Amino acid sequence: CDIYPIPSVLAVFFDSASKIVGMAQPSMAAAKNSLLSELYPEILNAETGFIDGTTVNMEALAALNPDVVFYSSGNKELGKQLTDAGYAAIAISANKWQYNAIETLNNWIDLLSQLFPENNKSEKVRTYSESVYNMVQERVSSIPDAEKAKVFFLFQYSASNISTSGNSFFGQWWATAIGAKNVGEELDSDKSTNVNMEQIYKWDPDFIFITNFNTAKPDDIYNNTVGSFDWSGVKAVKDKNVYKMPLGMYRTYTAGVDTPITLLWLAKATYPERFEDVDITAKTKEYYSDVFGITLTDEQSARIFAPLTQAGKLSVK
């Protein structure tokens, strides 16, 4: 599947990964370094060699003998290839809902519930995710524009590259959903876009959220350990407001089963005084237990918010 969060969504939806025979390398790298492989060790048996980026080796796929193949709805060519080869090919979109992570998760679960009605989780997921969204809105909707926190999502980061969310990607939705301002919203681009330090200094964000699509940790920003970038004058760095995003069942920047918890975590990190009563570890346990019947220990729950560096690598080589 070339929609990377989907294997984790399937595993949690079925409460089993035994039927997942293949996935892309970025999905496997996240699985290996997250709770997903601890809860469902059989996921590590899935093959990754049949897909490279968006290119599928049809011979290698045939060897896996899948009953159903999920693919990105944007990849029409692959959809045709799969259908022509006789597979039950199911198109899944990551951007049909304008990168609204809550709606994307709800619709993914709706689709899976239609395909596999005996595992129907539509109502439970939708009820919980919408209650979290509404609770956050109640607490942040009154924040005047002039007082909204300015947030910067560090999507990918290397010695030669900094990328963030423009106005049409998950970062824009997350920022709006927590009553903040995505500093990259002036960038009219779909998905991520490259920026330089001069631009970041101009924006001077109050908060920096580092995704798990790179291996950087807050200390790498505080200590300027990557390339020759100097972050020391940025407000978020001076105020020690640089955070690594959680890694639950998958990288939480995108839509996925962790989305309701990610929304709460982001809101609490940005506006701690408005979410003082929210115990994020307890909420995580409650969510997985009530919605999916999955019991997490306090330690497992807390680990979601202290992700491993290796999860930021997009290959398992």
PLM regions and their residue ranges:
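Extracellular/periplasmic catalytic domains that process cell-envelope and extracellular macromolecules
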Residues: F14-D15, A62-A63, L82-D84, I143-E147, ...
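Extracytoplasmic substrate-binding proteins
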Residues: L78-S160, E185, V237-K238, K244-V316
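Short acidic active-site motifs
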Residues: V56-N57, L78, V195-Q199
